[in-house]
Amino acid sequence: MTSDIEIARAATLKPMAAIAARLGIPDEAIIPFGRSKAKLSGDFIATLKDRPRGKLILVTAISPTPAGEGKTTTTVGLGDGLSRIGKKVAICLREPSLGPCFGMKGGAAGGGMAQVVPMEDINLHFTGDFHAITSAHNLLAALIDNHVHWGNEQQIDSRRIALRRVLDMNDRSLRNLVTGLGGPAHGTPREGGFDITVASEVMAILCLARDLADLEERLGDIVIAERADRSRVTARDIGAAGAMTVLLKDAFQPNLVQTLEHTPTFIHGGPFANIAHGCNTLVATDTALRLADYVVTEAGFGADLGAEKFFDIKCRKGGLEPSAAVLVATIRALKMNGGVPKDQLGAENVAAVEAGCANLGRHIENLAKFGVPVVVAINHFTADSEAEVAAVEAFCEARGVKAVLATHWAEGGQGTQKLAEAVSELVEGGSSRFAPLYPDDMPLVDKIETVAQSIYRAGSVVFERSARLQLERWQEAGYGHLPVCMAKTQYSFSADPALTGAPEGHELPVREVRLSAGAGFVVAVCGAIMTMPGLPRKPAALDIHLNAEGEVEGLF
Protein backbone atom coordinates (compact mmCIF):
# COMPACT_ATOMS: atom_id res chain seq x y z
CA MET A 1 0.00 0.00 0.00
CA THR A 2 1.33 3.43 -0.96
CA SER A 3 1.91 5.64 2.10
CA ASP A 4 0.47 9.14 2.47
CA ILE A 5 3.89 10.73 2.13
CA GLU A 6 4.64 8.74 -1.04
CA ILE A 7 1.34 9.89 -2.56
CA ALA A 8 2.09 13.49 -1.57
CA ARG A 9 5.61 13.34 -2.95
CA ALA A 10 4.40 11.98 -6.30
CA ALA A 11 1.91 14.83 -6.72
CA THR A 12 2.40 17.53 -9.33
CA LEU A 13 1.92 20.86 -7.59
CA LYS A 14 0.79 23.99 -9.38
CA PRO A 15 2.57 27.32 -8.82
CA MET A 16 1.07 29.29 -5.94
CA ALA A 17 0.12 32.12 -8.30
CA ALA A 18 -2.13 29.67 -10.18
CA ILE A 19 -3.75 28.45 -6.95
CA ALA A 20 -4.32 32.04 -5.80
CA ALA A 21 -5.80 32.94 -9.19
CA ARG A 22 -8.56 30.36 -8.67
CA LEU A 23 -9.85 32.66 -5.92
CA GLY A 24 -9.14 35.88 -7.80
CA ILE A 25 -6.08 36.74 -5.71
CA PRO A 26 -3.55 38.83 -7.68
CA ASP A 27 0.15 37.94 -7.75
CA GLU A 28 1.14 40.98 -5.70
CA ALA A 29 -1.10 39.84 -2.82
CA ILE A 30 0.77 36.59 -2.19
CA ILE A 31 4.02 36.33 -0.24
CA PRO A 32 5.80 33.18 -1.48
CA PHE A 33 7.47 30.72 0.88
CA GLY A 34 9.36 28.68 -1.69
CA ARG A 35 7.38 27.27 -4.61
CA SER A 36 4.52 25.53 -2.84
CA LYS A 37 3.52 27.72 0.12
CA ALA A 38 2.50 31.35 0.44
CA LYS A 39 1.03 33.89 2.82
CA LEU A 40 -1.70 36.33 1.91
CA SER A 41 -0.83 39.96 2.57
CA GLY A 42 -2.74 41.88 5.21
CA ASP A 43 -3.09 44.85 2.86
CA PHE A 44 -4.98 42.71 0.34
CA ILE A 45 -7.18 41.19 3.04
CA ALA A 46 -8.18 44.69 4.17
CA THR A 47 -9.60 45.39 0.69
CA LEU A 48 -12.06 42.49 1.01
CA LYS A 49 -14.05 43.71 4.01
CA ASP A 50 -17.04 44.98 2.01
CA ARG A 51 -17.40 41.86 -0.14
CA PRO A 52 -20.32 39.51 0.63
CA ARG A 53 -19.49 36.24 2.32
CA GLY A 54 -19.90 32.85 0.68
CA LYS A 55 -21.46 29.76 2.23
CA LEU A 56 -19.75 28.21 5.27
CA ILE A 57 -19.80 24.43 5.76
CA LEU A 58 -18.57 22.82 8.97
CA VAL A 59 -17.15 19.29 8.98
CA THR A 60 -17.46 17.65 12.39
CA ALA A 61 -17.65 14.06 13.64
CA ILE A 62 -19.17 11.57 16.03
CA SER A 63 -17.34 11.01 19.33
CA PRO A 64 -13.76 10.13 18.36
CA THR A 65 -12.28 6.73 19.07
CA PRO A 66 -8.79 5.24 18.68
CA ALA A 67 -10.16 3.77 15.44
CA GLY A 68 -10.21 7.27 13.90
CA GLU A 69 -12.92 9.07 11.95
CA GLY A 70 -10.97 10.90 9.21
CA LYS A 71 -12.40 14.38 9.74
CA THR A 72 -9.54 16.27 8.07
CA THR A 73 -9.44 13.76 5.22
CA THR A 74 -13.18 14.26 4.70
CA THR A 75 -12.82 18.05 4.83
CA VAL A 76 -10.21 17.89 2.07
CA GLY A 77 -12.18 15.33 0.07
CA LEU A 78 -15.38 17.38 0.28
CA GLY A 79 -13.55 20.50 -0.88
CA ASP A 80 -12.22 18.61 -3.89
CA GLY A 81 -15.67 17.12 -4.54
CA LEU A 82 -17.33 20.54 -4.51
CA SER A 83 -14.68 21.79 -6.91
CA ARG A 84 -15.43 18.87 -9.24
CA ILE A 85 -19.12 19.78 -9.41
CA GLY A 86 -18.24 23.32 -10.44
CA LYS A 87 -18.22 25.24 -7.17
CA LYS A 88 -15.71 27.99 -6.39
CA VAL A 89 -14.41 26.56 -3.14
CA ALA A 90 -11.75 27.08 -0.49
CA ILE A 91 -10.80 24.86 2.44
CA CYS A 92 -9.79 26.12 5.90
CA LEU A 93 -7.78 23.90 8.28
CA ARG A 94 -5.69 24.15 11.44
CA GLU A 95 -1.91 23.93 11.37
CA PRO A 96 -0.45 20.70 12.79
CA SER A 97 1.64 20.79 15.97
CA LEU A 98 5.11 19.26 16.11
CA GLY A 99 4.33 17.60 19.45
CA PRO A 100 1.61 15.20 18.24
CA CYS A 101 3.42 14.82 14.89
CA PHE A 102 6.42 13.24 16.64
CA GLY A 103 4.24 11.68 19.33
CA MET A 104 1.23 9.62 18.28
CA LYS A 105 -0.25 11.08 15.11
CA GLY A 106 2.73 11.20 12.77
CA GLY A 107 1.22 13.92 10.57
CA ALA A 108 -2.06 15.80 10.09
CA ALA A 109 -2.70 16.97 6.53
CA GLY A 110 -5.38 14.52 5.44
CA GLY A 111 -4.64 11.11 4.00
CA GLY A 112 -4.65 8.92 0.92
CA MET A 113 -5.90 10.80 -2.13
CA ALA A 114 -7.46 13.52 0.04
CA GLN A 115 -4.40 15.42 1.24
CA VAL A 116 -3.05 18.93 1.45
CA VAL A 117 0.46 19.41 0.08
CA PRO A 118 3.40 19.88 0.55
CA MET A 119 2.66 17.39 3.32
CA GLU A 120 6.03 17.25 5.07
CA ASP A 121 6.43 21.04 5.08
CA ILE A 122 2.96 21.53 6.56
CA ASN A 123 3.60 18.96 9.29
CA LEU A 124 7.04 20.29 10.23
CA HIS A 125 7.98 23.99 10.38
CA PHE A 126 5.57 25.22 7.66
CA THR A 127 5.85 29.04 7.53
CA GLY A 128 7.09 29.51 11.09
CA ASP A 129 3.79 30.62 12.66
CA PHE A 130 4.13 28.34 15.69
CA HIS A 131 7.67 29.60 16.28
CA ALA A 132 6.36 33.18 16.31
CA ILE A 133 3.53 32.28 18.71
CA THR A 134 5.95 30.43 20.99
CA SER A 135 8.31 33.42 20.95
CA ALA A 136 5.57 35.96 21.69
CA HIS A 137 4.24 33.87 24.57
CA ASN A 138 7.69 33.32 26.08
CA LEU A 139 8.55 37.01 25.69
CA LEU A 140 5.55 37.72 27.93
CA ALA A 141 6.77 35.12 30.43
CA ALA A 142 10.24 36.69 30.46
CA LEU A 143 8.79 40.19 30.93
CA ILE A 144 6.75 39.00 33.92
CA ASP A 145 9.80 37.63 35.72
CA ASN A 146 11.82 40.68 34.72
CA HIS A 147 9.13 42.98 36.13
CA VAL A 148 9.22 41.15 39.46
CA HIS A 149 13.05 41.23 39.49
CA TRP A 150 13.32 45.00 38.90
CA GLY A 151 11.13 46.29 41.72
CA ASN A 152 7.71 44.76 40.94
CA GLU A 153 5.87 48.05 40.39
CA GLN A 154 2.60 46.19 39.74
CA GLN A 155 2.95 44.28 43.05
CA ILE A 156 2.62 40.90 41.35
CA ASP A 157 2.25 38.06 43.85
CA SER A 158 4.81 35.55 42.53
CA ARG A 159 2.73 32.74 44.03
CA ARG A 160 -0.15 33.72 41.77
CA ILE A 161 1.52 34.05 38.37
CA ALA A 162 -0.85 32.27 35.98
CA LEU A 163 1.23 32.27 32.81
CA ARG A 164 3.47 29.26 32.11
CA ARG A 165 6.02 29.04 29.32
CA VAL A 166 5.33 27.07 26.12
CA LEU A 167 7.12 24.77 23.70
CA ASP A 168 5.80 23.08 20.54
CA MET A 169 6.82 19.61 21.69
CA ASN A 170 5.48 16.77 23.84
CA ASP A 171 7.75 16.72 26.93
CA ARG A 172 6.31 15.55 30.25
CA SER A 173 9.49 16.44 32.16
CA LEU A 174 8.77 20.15 31.63
CA ARG A 175 5.28 20.13 33.18
CA ASN A 176 6.38 21.26 36.63
CA LEU A 177 9.57 23.22 37.32
CA VAL A 178 11.13 25.63 39.80
CA THR A 179 12.65 28.67 38.08
CA GLY A 180 14.87 31.48 39.34
CA LEU A 181 17.32 29.27 41.24
CA GLY A 182 20.96 30.27 41.73
CA GLY A 183 20.73 33.37 43.90
CA PRO A 184 19.37 36.95 43.64
CA ALA A 185 21.11 37.66 40.32
CA HIS A 186 19.13 34.89 38.63
CA GLY A 187 15.58 35.92 39.48
CA THR A 188 13.00 35.10 42.12
CA PRO A 189 12.50 31.37 42.73
CA ARG A 190 8.97 30.18 42.02
CA GLU A 191 7.08 27.20 40.71
CA GLY A 192 6.34 27.17 37.00
CA GLY A 193 6.33 24.88 34.01
CA PHE A 194 5.70 24.51 30.29
CA ASP A 195 2.56 23.89 28.24
CA ILE A 196 2.52 22.87 24.59
CA THR A 197 2.25 25.88 22.23
CA VAL A 198 -1.23 24.97 21.00
CA ALA A 199 -2.46 25.37 24.61
CA SER A 200 -1.20 28.97 24.76
CA GLU A 201 -3.77 31.74 25.10
CA VAL A 202 -1.66 33.62 22.54
CA MET A 203 -2.58 30.90 20.03
CA ALA A 204 -6.28 31.24 20.83
CA ILE A 205 -6.02 35.03 20.54
CA LEU A 206 -4.33 34.83 17.13
CA CYS A 207 -7.16 32.58 15.99
CA LEU A 208 -9.96 34.92 17.14
CA ALA A 209 -8.51 38.38 16.39
CA ARG A 210 -10.06 40.32 13.50
CA ASP A 211 -7.02 42.45 12.62
CA LEU A 212 -3.67 43.57 14.05
CA ALA A 213 -5.25 46.28 16.21
CA ASP A 214 -7.66 43.75 17.70
CA LEU A 215 -4.75 41.33 18.15
CA GLU A 216 -2.78 43.87 20.20
CA GLU A 217 -5.84 44.76 22.28
CA ARG A 218 -6.51 41.11 23.08
CA LEU A 219 -2.87 40.42 23.93
CA GLY A 220 -2.99 43.30 26.38
CA ASP A 221 -6.07 41.76 28.03
CA ILE A 222 -4.28 38.52 29.00
CA VAL A 223 -4.49 38.09 32.77
CA ILE A 224 -0.96 37.11 33.76
CA ALA A 225 -1.11 37.16 37.57
CA GLU A 226 -2.83 38.46 40.68
CA ARG A 227 -1.73 40.81 43.43
CA ALA A 228 -1.96 39.93 47.12
CA ASP A 229 -5.42 41.52 47.23
CA ARG A 230 -6.50 39.19 44.35
CA SER A 231 -6.79 42.04 41.85
CA ARG A 232 -5.75 41.07 38.32
CA VAL A 233 -2.56 42.07 36.49
CA THR A 234 -2.64 42.04 32.68
CA ALA A 235 -0.03 41.94 29.93
CA ARG A 236 -0.93 45.58 29.23
CA ASP A 237 -0.02 46.54 32.81
CA ILE A 238 3.60 45.48 32.26
CA GLY A 239 3.80 46.93 28.73
CA ALA A 240 4.11 43.62 26.86
CA ALA A 241 1.39 43.80 24.19
CA GLY A 242 3.22 45.95 21.62
CA ALA A 243 6.34 43.80 21.34
CA MET A 244 4.24 40.63 21.28
CA THR A 245 2.23 42.01 18.37
CA VAL A 246 5.43 42.80 16.46
CA LEU A 247 6.51 39.16 16.81
CA LEU A 248 3.11 38.00 15.54
CA LYS A 249 2.73 40.51 12.69
CA ASP A 250 3.70 38.10 9.90
CA ALA A 251 2.23 35.02 11.58
CA PHE A 252 -1.17 36.76 11.54
CA GLN A 253 -1.24 36.58 7.72
CA PRO A 254 -3.04 33.40 6.52
CA ASN A 255 -1.12 30.60 4.80
CA LEU A 256 -2.23 29.34 1.39
CA VAL A 257 -1.45 25.87 -0.01
CA GLN A 258 -3.27 23.34 -2.23
CA THR A 259 -4.82 19.88 -2.16
CA LEU A 260 -3.68 17.04 -4.43
CA GLU A 261 -6.43 18.24 -6.80
CA HIS A 262 -5.29 21.89 -6.51
CA THR A 263 -8.17 23.19 -4.39
CA PRO A 264 -6.99 26.37 -2.58
CA THR A 265 -6.52 25.66 1.12
CA PHE A 266 -5.90 28.06 4.00
CA ILE A 267 -4.01 26.42 6.87
CA HIS A 268 -3.65 28.89 9.72
CA GLY A 269 -3.55 28.63 13.50
CA GLY A 270 -4.12 25.57 15.64
CA PRO A 271 -5.51 25.99 19.17
CA PHE A 272 -6.22 23.04 21.47
CA ALA A 273 -9.75 21.70 21.09
CA ASN A 274 -10.26 21.23 24.84
CA ILE A 275 -8.98 24.29 26.77
CA ALA A 276 -9.46 26.42 23.64
CA HIS A 277 -11.90 26.41 20.73
CA GLY A 278 -10.06 24.09 18.31
CA CYS A 279 -10.62 26.01 15.06
CA ASN A 280 -8.40 27.69 12.46
CA THR A 281 -8.07 31.48 12.49
CA LEU A 282 -11.06 33.74 12.09
CA VAL A 283 -9.10 35.92 9.66
CA ALA A 284 -8.42 32.93 7.37
CA THR A 285 -12.05 31.80 7.45
CA ASP A 286 -13.41 35.30 6.84
CA THR A 287 -10.92 35.88 4.01
CA ALA A 288 -11.89 32.59 2.37
CA LEU A 289 -15.58 33.49 2.65
CA ARG A 290 -14.92 36.81 0.86
CA LEU A 291 -13.12 34.99 -1.97
CA ALA A 292 -15.03 31.72 -2.49
CA ASP A 293 -18.66 30.71 -2.92
CA TYR A 294 -18.21 27.69 -0.63
CA VAL A 295 -15.82 27.37 2.32
CA VAL A 296 -15.29 24.00 3.99
CA THR A 297 -13.75 24.00 7.46
CA GLU A 298 -13.46 21.66 10.44
CA ALA A 299 -13.49 21.83 14.23
CA GLY A 300 -11.51 19.64 16.63
CA PHE A 301 -12.77 16.39 18.20
CA GLY A 302 -16.45 15.37 18.01
CA ALA A 303 -19.47 17.60 17.53
CA ASP A 304 -20.13 17.82 21.29
CA LEU A 305 -16.83 19.68 21.76
CA GLY A 306 -15.65 20.98 18.39
CA ALA A 307 -18.93 21.94 16.76
CA GLU A 308 -20.33 23.45 19.97
CA LYS A 309 -17.26 25.68 20.34
CA PHE A 310 -17.24 26.52 16.64
CA PHE A 311 -20.84 27.73 16.93
CA ASP A 312 -20.77 29.27 20.41
CA ILE A 313 -17.29 30.83 20.32
CA LYS A 314 -15.93 31.27 16.78
CA CYS A 315 -19.21 32.02 14.98
CA ARG A 316 -20.37 34.25 17.84
CA LYS A 317 -17.08 36.22 17.87
CA GLY A 318 -16.83 36.47 14.09
CA GLY A 319 -20.45 36.98 13.16
CA LEU A 320 -20.34 33.81 11.04
CA GLU A 321 -23.48 31.97 9.92
CA PRO A 322 -22.83 28.38 8.82
CA SER A 323 -25.08 27.06 6.06
CA ALA A 324 -24.62 23.32 6.68
CA ALA A 325 -22.77 20.75 8.76
CA VAL A 326 -21.25 17.46 7.64
CA LEU A 327 -21.15 14.82 10.39
CA VAL A 328 -18.41 12.26 9.72
CA ALA A 329 -18.91 8.69 10.93
CA THR A 330 -17.07 5.44 10.26
CA ILE A 331 -18.41 1.92 10.55
CA ARG A 332 -15.55 0.89 12.80
CA ALA A 333 -16.04 3.85 15.15
CA LEU A 334 -19.76 3.08 15.37
CA LYS A 335 -18.85 -0.51 16.26
CA MET A 336 -16.61 0.73 19.07
CA ASN A 337 -19.44 2.92 20.36
CA GLY A 338 -21.57 -0.22 20.14
CA GLY A 339 -19.21 -2.09 22.46
CA VAL A 340 -16.85 -3.92 20.07
CA PRO A 341 -13.15 -4.05 21.15
CA LYS A 342 -10.63 -2.49 18.77
CA ASP A 343 -9.08 -5.85 17.86
CA GLN A 344 -12.45 -7.18 16.62
CA LEU A 345 -13.46 -4.30 14.36
CA GLY A 346 -12.64 -6.17 11.14
CA ALA A 347 -15.51 -8.66 11.49
CA GLU A 348 -18.99 -7.76 10.24
CA ASN A 349 -21.28 -6.84 13.14
CA VAL A 350 -24.46 -5.10 12.05
CA ALA A 351 -25.96 -5.25 15.55
CA ALA A 352 -22.98 -3.36 17.00
CA VAL A 353 -23.24 -0.74 14.25
CA GLU A 354 -26.92 -0.25 15.07
CA ALA A 355 -26.11 0.05 18.78
CA GLY A 356 -23.33 2.55 18.05
CA CYS A 357 -25.71 4.67 15.99
CA ALA A 358 -27.06 5.98 19.30
CA ASN A 359 -23.91 8.14 19.41
CA LEU A 360 -24.48 9.30 15.83
CA GLY A 361 -28.11 10.12 16.62
CA ARG A 362 -27.15 12.19 19.65
CA HIS A 363 -24.80 14.33 17.55
CA ILE A 364 -27.49 14.79 14.88
CA GLU A 365 -29.92 16.00 17.56
CA ASN A 366 -27.32 18.38 19.01
CA LEU A 367 -26.48 19.96 15.66
CA ALA A 368 -30.19 20.57 15.06
CA LYS A 369 -30.28 22.64 18.27
CA PHE A 370 -28.10 25.23 16.51
CA GLY A 371 -30.47 25.40 13.54
CA VAL A 372 -27.90 24.04 11.08
CA PRO A 373 -28.97 21.35 8.56
CA VAL A 374 -26.89 18.15 8.58
CA VAL A 375 -25.70 15.50 6.14
CA VAL A 376 -23.87 12.41 7.40
CA ALA A 377 -20.69 11.34 5.60
CA ILE A 378 -19.87 7.65 6.02
CA ASN A 379 -16.09 7.63 5.63
CA HIS A 380 -15.49 4.31 3.87
CA PHE A 381 -12.94 1.70 4.92
CA THR A 382 -12.27 -1.51 2.98
CA ALA A 383 -13.54 -3.74 5.82
CA ASP A 384 -17.00 -2.10 5.80
CA SER A 385 -19.76 -4.44 4.64
CA GLU A 386 -22.77 -3.40 2.55
CA ALA A 387 -25.10 -4.48 5.36
CA GLU A 388 -23.28 -2.28 7.89
CA VAL A 389 -23.41 0.74 5.59
CA ALA A 390 -27.10 0.08 4.89
CA ALA A 391 -27.80 0.04 8.64
CA VAL A 392 -26.34 3.55 9.01
CA GLU A 393 -28.22 4.83 5.97
CA ALA A 394 -31.50 3.44 7.33
CA PHE A 395 -30.86 4.95 10.78
CA CYS A 396 -30.29 8.39 9.27
CA GLU A 397 -33.22 8.14 6.85
CA ALA A 398 -35.55 7.41 9.77
CA ARG A 399 -34.43 10.73 11.29
CA GLY A 400 -34.85 12.74 8.11
CA VAL A 401 -31.11 13.06 7.50
CA LYS A 402 -29.27 11.96 4.38
CA ALA A 403 -26.25 9.67 4.76
CA VAL A 404 -23.75 9.44 1.91
CA LEU A 405 -20.94 6.91 1.50
CA ALA A 406 -17.67 8.76 0.79
CA THR A 407 -14.60 7.08 -0.73
CA HIS A 408 -12.27 10.06 -0.87
CA TRP A 409 -9.30 8.33 0.81
CA ALA A 410 -9.06 5.98 -2.18
CA GLU A 411 -10.55 8.15 -4.94
CA GLY A 412 -10.06 11.78 -3.91
CA GLY A 413 -12.71 14.25 -5.04
CA GLN A 414 -14.31 11.67 -7.33
CA GLY A 415 -15.25 9.71 -4.21
CA THR A 416 -17.07 12.67 -2.65
CA GLN A 417 -19.07 13.98 -5.61
CA LYS A 418 -22.33 12.52 -4.24
CA LEU A 419 -21.53 14.00 -0.83
CA ALA A 420 -20.74 17.35 -2.47
CA GLU A 421 -24.07 17.28 -4.31
CA ALA A 422 -25.94 16.50 -1.09
CA VAL A 423 -24.16 19.33 0.73
CA SER A 424 -24.79 21.76 -2.14
CA GLU A 425 -28.47 20.85 -2.08
CA LEU A 426 -28.64 21.61 1.66
CA VAL A 427 -26.77 24.89 1.28
CA GLU A 428 -28.77 26.15 -1.68
CA GLY A 429 -32.00 25.12 0.06
CA GLY A 430 -31.38 27.93 2.54
CA SER A 431 -32.77 25.97 5.48
CA SER A 432 -30.10 27.06 7.98
CA ARG A 433 -31.48 29.06 10.90
CA PHE A 434 -28.27 29.30 12.88
CA ALA A 435 -28.31 30.59 16.44
CA PRO A 436 -25.86 30.01 19.32
CA LEU A 437 -26.99 27.78 22.18
CA TYR A 438 -27.19 30.57 24.77
CA PRO A 439 -27.28 34.40 24.85
CA ASP A 440 -24.33 36.58 25.89
CA ASP A 441 -26.11 37.90 28.96
CA MET A 442 -26.74 34.48 30.53
CA PRO A 443 -24.68 34.09 33.76
CA LEU A 444 -21.50 32.02 33.46
CA VAL A 445 -22.75 29.24 35.74
CA ASP A 446 -25.95 28.95 33.70
CA LYS A 447 -23.98 28.81 30.43
CA ILE A 448 -21.95 25.86 31.72
CA GLU A 449 -25.10 24.09 32.89
CA THR A 450 -26.82 24.78 29.55
CA VAL A 451 -24.04 23.12 27.55
CA ALA A 452 -23.80 20.22 30.02
CA GLN A 453 -27.51 19.48 30.03
CA SER A 454 -28.42 20.33 26.44
CA ILE A 455 -25.38 18.92 24.61
CA TYR A 456 -23.89 16.34 27.00
CA ARG A 457 -27.28 15.30 28.52
CA ALA A 458 -25.82 15.54 32.02
CA GLY A 459 -28.28 15.04 34.85
CA SER A 460 -26.41 17.50 37.06
CA VAL A 461 -23.33 19.71 37.14
CA VAL A 462 -21.24 19.61 40.30
CA PHE A 463 -18.97 22.63 40.80
CA GLU A 464 -15.98 22.57 43.11
CA ARG A 465 -16.58 25.32 45.67
CA SER A 466 -13.51 27.27 44.51
CA ALA A 467 -14.69 27.08 40.88
CA ARG A 468 -18.14 28.42 41.69
CA LEU A 469 -16.70 31.26 43.79
CA GLN A 470 -14.30 32.17 40.99
CA LEU A 471 -17.14 32.27 38.46
CA GLU A 472 -19.08 34.57 40.78
CA ARG A 473 -16.06 36.90 41.09
CA TRP A 474 -15.61 37.04 37.32
CA GLN A 475 -19.32 37.65 36.85
CA GLU A 476 -19.10 40.66 39.20
CA ALA A 477 -15.89 41.87 37.52
CA GLY A 478 -17.61 42.20 34.13
CA TYR A 479 -16.63 38.94 32.43
CA GLY A 480 -20.12 37.45 32.58
CA HIS A 481 -20.81 38.19 28.91
CA LEU A 482 -18.07 35.81 27.74
CA PRO A 483 -18.90 32.40 26.22
CA VAL A 484 -17.75 29.26 28.01
CA CYS A 485 -15.20 26.78 26.67
CA MET A 486 -15.72 23.27 28.04
CA ALA A 487 -12.56 21.24 28.63
CA LYS A 488 -13.33 17.55 29.00
CA THR A 489 -12.52 14.18 27.46
CA GLN A 490 -13.30 13.95 23.76
CA TYR A 491 -14.16 10.25 23.95
CA SER A 492 -17.52 10.56 25.70
CA PHE A 493 -20.46 12.89 26.20
CA SER A 494 -19.61 12.57 29.89
CA ALA A 495 -16.39 13.30 31.78
CA ASP A 496 -15.63 9.55 31.82
CA PRO A 497 -13.82 8.44 28.63
CA ALA A 498 -14.98 4.84 29.14
CA LEU A 499 -18.67 5.85 28.99
CA THR A 500 -19.21 5.55 25.22
CA GLY A 501 -22.40 5.59 23.19
CA ALA A 502 -25.04 8.13 24.23
CA PRO A 503 -25.13 8.29 28.05
CA GLU A 504 -27.75 10.36 29.85
CA GLY A 505 -28.25 11.59 33.39
CA HIS A 506 -24.57 11.49 34.32
CA GLU A 507 -22.86 13.90 36.70
CA LEU A 508 -20.50 16.44 35.14
CA PRO A 509 -17.82 17.70 37.55
CA VAL A 510 -16.36 21.20 37.11
CA ARG A 511 -13.19 21.07 39.16
CA GLU A 512 -11.52 24.26 37.92
CA VAL A 513 -12.24 27.36 35.84
CA ARG A 514 -9.75 29.50 33.93
CA LEU A 515 -10.18 33.00 32.53
CA SER A 516 -8.89 33.52 28.99
CA ALA A 517 -9.68 37.24 28.98
CA GLY A 518 -7.64 37.98 25.86
CA ALA A 519 -9.16 35.20 23.80
CA GLY A 520 -12.54 36.11 25.24
CA PHE A 521 -13.88 32.97 26.93
CA VAL A 522 -14.01 31.20 30.29
CA VAL A 523 -12.69 27.64 30.42
CA ALA A 524 -14.55 25.09 32.55
CA VAL A 525 -12.25 22.15 33.29
CA CYS A 526 -14.20 18.90 33.70
CA GLY A 527 -11.84 16.14 34.77
CA ALA A 528 -8.10 15.89 34.16
CA ILE A 529 -6.81 17.99 31.25
CA MET A 530 -3.17 17.75 30.20
CA THR A 531 -1.72 20.95 28.70
CA MET A 532 1.74 19.44 28.15
CA PRO A 533 1.43 15.96 26.63
CA GLY A 534 4.07 13.28 27.00
CA LEU A 535 5.46 11.00 24.33
CA PRO A 536 4.13 7.40 24.12
CA ARG A 537 6.31 4.35 24.72
CA LYS A 538 7.05 4.18 20.98
CA PRO A 539 6.74 7.73 19.62
CA ALA A 540 6.19 8.35 15.92
CA ALA A 541 9.55 10.16 15.92
CA LEU A 542 11.34 6.79 16.02
CA ASP A 543 10.08 6.00 12.50
CA ILE A 544 10.79 9.43 10.97
CA HIS A 545 14.08 9.81 9.08
CA LEU A 546 15.74 10.91 5.85
CA ASN A 547 16.32 8.33 3.13
CA ALA A 548 19.41 8.10 0.91
CA GLU A 549 17.96 10.79 -1.39
CA GLY A 550 17.47 13.20 1.51
CA GLU A 551 13.69 12.79 1.51
CA VAL A 552 11.57 12.58 4.66
CA GLU A 553 10.12 9.17 5.47
CA GLY A 554 7.82 8.06 8.28
CA LEU A 555 5.34 10.96 8.29
CA PHE A 556 2.62 8.41 7.44
From Swiss-Prot:
ATP binds at residues 65-72. It is an enzyme of class 6 (ligase). Transmembrane segments: none annotated. Pathway: One-carbon metabolism; tetrahydrofolate interconversion. GO terms for molecular function: ATP binding; formate-tetrahydrofolate ligase activity. Coiled coil: none annotated. It catalyses: (6S)-5,6,7,8-tetrahydrofolate + formate + ATP = (6R)-10-formyltetrahydrofolate + ADP + phosphate. One of its GO terms (biological process) is tetrahydrofolate interconversion. Keywords: ATP-binding, Ligase, Nucleotide-binding, One-carbon metabolism. Its EC number is 6.3.4.3. NCBIfam families: PRK13505.1. Belongs to the formate--tetrahydrofolate ligase family. This is Formate--tetrahydrofolate ligase. It comes from Maricaulis maris (strain MCS10).
